[in-house]
Amino acid sequence: MSELTIFKNIKIDDVERMLKCFEARKLVYKKDRTILSNLVNTKVIGIVLDGTANMVRYDYNGNRTIIEKLERDSIFGEVFSYLGNDISVVATSDCEVLFFDYTYLINRCKKSCMCHSMLTDNVLQLLSKKIIELNERLEVLSKRTTRDKLLGYFDLLVKGRVDRFFYLPFSYTELADYLSVDRSAMMREIKNLKEDGIITVNGKKIVLNY
């Protein structure tokens, strides 16, 4: 548990004590089960301990947009209520989630222990990181064509890396929902990118040739 970013630099004994103080609970969800139905007024913070989930939004026609993929160490819940009340979190594999009440984060316990301050700092770091990632996603979505959206997203996946390949974190259907594009049009554009020699595709492995 102490290897999670939210508990960074906090001793394992202090982590266990805080979880008990916070009345934290672990819940297990099967694939495709809804973990949270909306992020507003949930009053909880969730941390993915194992498995994966998607943060999703559905419009009035039932069209899905994937906001973010959540993996081990990802945080969600009340801290992301600014995204709106129509955001849900859905398990994409069997997963285990740790929950605790948001009020324990913002209200100091009577002891005002140092580990509580460190926890708050860690959450703020996670929030800052997520805001940067969401802004990068908005930049990708602002591109006019499906081709530019794909290449913009691919560039994000290799950002800061020496090699120029990656494994898609989504299925192709999920990727289309993440980029807010038609799946058939997206697959045609991926085919065009392959034929133009810009990318090489082997299953979910994609190599950027530029």
What name fits each language-model region?
Residues 1-31, 75-76, 80-82:
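Cyclic nucleotide-binding regulatory module and flanking cytosolic helices
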Residues 11, 30-33, 59-76:
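Short acidic-glycine-tyrosine-enriched beta hairpin
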Residues 21-22, 32-45, 63-64, 82-85:
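A short beta-loop-beta micro-motif enriched in histidine and acidic residues
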Residues 43-56, 72-73:
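Glycine- and acidic-residue-biased ligand/ion/polar-headgroup-sensing regions
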Residues 66-124:
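Cyclic-nucleotide recognition modules
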Residues 117-120, 124-134, 138:
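Long, hydrophobic or amphipathic alpha-helical segments
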Residues 119, 142, 146-149, 171:
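N-terminal positioning helix adjacent to the helix-turn-helix/winged-helix DNA-binding module
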Residues 155-210:
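Phosphate-/nucleic-acid-contacting segments
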